[in-house]
Amino acid sequence: MAIEQEHRKKASGWAARDSSGVLSPFNFYRRETGEKDVTFKVLYCGICHSDLHMVKNEWGFSTYPLVPGHEIVGEVTEVGSKVQKFKVGDRVGVGCIVGSCRSCENCTDHLENYCPKQILTYGAKYYDGSTTYGGYSDIMVADEHFIVRIPDNLPLDGAAPLLCAGITTYSPLRYFGLDKPGMHVGVVGLGGLGHVAVKFAKAMGVKVTVISTSPKKEEEALKHLGADSFLVSRDQDQMQAAIGTMDGIIDTVSAQHPLLPLIGLLNSHGKLVMVGAPEKPLELPVFPLLMGRKMVAGSGIGGMKETQEMIDFAARHNITADIEVIPIDYLNTAMERLVKADVRYRFVIDIGNTLKVRS
């Protein structure tokens, strides 16, 4: 049963009303702070490429009105009576999920991101039937279990994208054992995901090669992000020279691209981990996998324990996303630029200073 409006908090944000993807101001309600809930004032929210897919219903399950945003950071304004981890004034964040069953094998293993009953931060339904709205809004209410603490030395705007892009790349580096000093890891694509993958891998002591279709990104990869080497994936001579040299590859690309050349870069027992989500199936040649016991795997965000671990690791190593901070009324232009990959490397909305809240 939906909660009555008089028992909800008024909220203001920006929403898409249909698959045109155009966003505009939208007033709505969030639930009151429950006994295990944390309410916080949203200060910044990153724009993820999945937000673009969702506002345009490109994955086919969007519902409208849709308030996007799952890279949400801010300051706690209220806590429930049974909240133990947070207090008013704490710097906090919410990523891609705001609920799970908390009892299945995945949940008990701190893998809420793989719970069959996970609740996405926006465009989903809470167990009471109410709609989840994301971080393009002035306030957020969530169970404390799905909230992470942002250390004081991390700037909130640069930390916001870590709640999606950061954990999406950190988790496979850890899980697939590609975090050992001296290992050689490739990162395919130098965008919102790829640039933080390079930063995390380098902080772990890993040798990093960036693999890109664009020769223009070489200087950025080597001099700014600190990668050890750079491969132009369309340069057959470069790719041939690197065959069999990598322990693993994190593939962040969401566009159509061939996997065979990437598999060739792996050494025996090497792992190609897909974290991008192309709209159409990719062709997977099996024979090259057999000839080196190679693996192609996938990874999606991370559980709450690991997300906090990732944020703490980022704080220790001064890792933030490279961002362009925008006012919220620039949102539709930012979405158009995102389609063209015209951002270095993540848009972050300055919610706290630019969102006009309804009276």
Curated annotation (Swiss-Prot):
Cofactor entry = Zn(2+)
Q: What positions does the entry give for Zn(2+) 1 binding?
A: 48, 70, 164
A GO biological process of this protein is:
lignin biosynthetic process
Sorted alphabetically, the keyword list is: Metal-binding, NAD, Oxidoreductase, Zinc
Per the entry, the cofactor note is: Binds 2 Zn(2+) ions per subunit.
EC number(s): the record gives 1.1.1.255
**What does it catalyze?**
D-mannitol + NAD(+) = D-mannose + NADH + H(+)
State the SMART domains in the record: PKS_ER
Indicate which residues the UniProt annotation says bind Zn(2+) 2: 101, 104, 107, 115
Give the CDD domains listed for this entry.
CAD1
A GO molecular function assigned to this protein is: mannitol dehydrogenase activity
Top EC category: oxidoreductase
Pfam families to which the protein is assigned, alphabetical: ADH_N (PF08240), ADH_zinc_N (PF00107)
Describe the family membership recorded for this protein in Swiss-Prot or TrEMBL: Belongs to the zinc-containing alcohol dehydrogenase family.
Q: Which PANTHER family match?
A: ALDEHYDE REDUCTASE
Q: What does this protein do?
A: Oxidizes mannitol to mannose. Provides the initial step by which translocated mannitol is committed to central metabolism and, by regulating mannitol pool size, is important in regulating salt tolerance at the cellular level.
Supply the name of the protein: Probable mannitol dehydrogenase
